[in-house]
Amino acid sequence: MGMAVVVSPTQRPRPYPFKPVCSSTSKCRPAVILPGLGNNSGDYKKLEMTLNEYGVSTVVANVSRLDWFRNAAGLADPNYWRGTLRPRPVLDWYFKRIDEAIEKAKPLAPEGSLSLIGHSAGGWLARVYMEEFGFSDVSLLLTLGTPHLPPPKASPGVIDQTRGLLNYVEENCPKPVYTPQLKYVCVAGRYIQGARFFGNSYVDVDSVVPVNSDQPISEVAVMNNETNSTSVSTAFRARLVGQGYKQVCGQADVWGDGVVPEISAHLDGALNISLDGVYHSPVGSDDMLRPWYGSPAVVEKWIHHLLN
């Protein structure tokens, strides 16, 4: 059973009297950021700068948006059409980028260990990398909005978007065990609650996200204070988001970060954290109105795992 921690809604960025950093007598472990599906290295530049401010030397795996088209090679594999696709050799290009980033970060590691930060698919790709190539250099895997779990089989209307890749991860990668030698931390966002496309989709969010506060508010919560036309538009988006959630976890009316459901971003055996008001991607995010996992005020909620 994993350990779960629920953190109160993310506060708006504000000046702090001090920022926790590594002590002058010891350097932090360096961190390697692993981009999510469709993202490129540049999307994480601001996160890299934020981590550097905490004293965490950071390397971002070298990935471009065009690189992701390499995955189309999987279409030639019969396992793709059977839904039993394996990560290798289709994703070997990504594992090579992980390896190159780790080699670049090693000289920055005072004690020979480093942290992996996997965003979205980068999190489960890190798990495959650790299984295939070893993890002697890794002391922390921190995942941000990673869909760790495969969708339920034989669920009506659900198609495995990974074509079996997450089933492979579930069946072949070691179950996380949070230990002093290797820590697993899984961070999930609660940005918007999905809704079923048909049927009763009313969502009462007053008890989840306070509306009359200085906190960023999830999009479903905004329905309480908007005009009817805007509420209908927001409700329709909740249904669309819910259909996305359903393809990942088999349920539409659950909370998530707008792309990955909260329940899919947690792992048994890991330290699981949920953050209210946190959006999935750096693309389309806004540090004030739509903060993502790498926004400064959100990083503050998980940075201590890299500093310890």
Regions found by a protein language model. Name each.
Residues 2-308:
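Lipid deacylating catalytic domains
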